[in-house]
């Protein structure tokens, strides 16, 4: 397996090559084949650390850094050579919250807390087109920004006291001509097509606070509408159907701590969440207990709420801090990293831990490039000796099996002979 992990303490990235069964916390377990620092430019530090990474067409590693730079590296170069840097015009306090690849348009999109969005056309590796800056409608900041992978040009965002909104950023294709046009800004006219409404007041008639942390679009959507999922910094997961009003159609409390990441598991009926404590868990969106949560209020009496079924936790390997970097690879493997400085990979279906590697740095993001284990090469002479030993071992086992069979036959024959002798003696007595 080959996994890239951000190194928050140094501003670089670590490449980890390991196989299933690797565990650096055990001396007698497999150890990583290699761990090396990459993407370390002069002046890289915690102030310019990498927060997000994407694998762009298996050709480039695109990284968004604190400070507003977007760096492009050659994935096919052994040392991940830096090929270009975009410096985006943002304030010193602004922070990137999302990095999205739109491969069909040769574009990446970077969103910032301030609501600024930059669209960057890589132009087939020429990097000669200037990024286009877009300001999202509204004055409140955002903490979540995601594209709809099933409909080009449609995005969703939300933040603290800024409920989820669906925005159409553009229509049609983002071609090279758009970036070269004098009126290119006119192509990107953000249009809010849906704004969510807060849930009803609680049993004490208090308004629930709003803080969106992540958003996901469902592939299946209603006619003339959208279906999407949000998580909050108050431990809730909510499902929206825009054809059924502005409030969520389902609202589940899944944990007590703020949810940091939200991902679909191997199907859209299951989600994986991580929080600011040490939770990484899989929940069902289809298996719901409508009265699982019960509490009693002096004014309202007994209160029941629906709860999404917990399918299991990714707890093998002992998470001891917030998990802030989560990557799903081919709907089969989940890689995690966070404050406890460990990289862990799990099988999504069984939740079995596949590898655990201590890196000594805090982690903001992880990105798996390859899930295959590299076989260790052996000299031909050693391989020949091993084959001979295996053949000899199999031959001995076969001989032992034959000897055991002959011994068993002899034993049965002896028993039969003894039985015959006993029967004859009885007949004589009679």
Swiss-Prot record:
One of its GO terms (cellular component) is nucleolus. GO terms for biological process: ribosomal large subunit biogenesis; rRNA processing. Keywords: Nucleus, Ribosome biogenesis, rRNA processing. Residues 372-430 are annotated as: Disordered. Residues 372-382, 401-411 have a biased composition (Acidic residues). The keyword rRNA processing applies. Residues 386-397 have a biased composition (Basic residues). It is found in: Nucleus, Nucleolus. Component of the pre-66S ribosomal particle. Belongs to the NSA1 family. Involved in the biogenesis of the 60S ribosomal subunit. PANTHER family: NOP SEVEN ASSOCIATED PROTEIN 1, WD REPEAT-CONTAINING PROTEIN 74. This is Ribosome biogenesis protein NSA1.
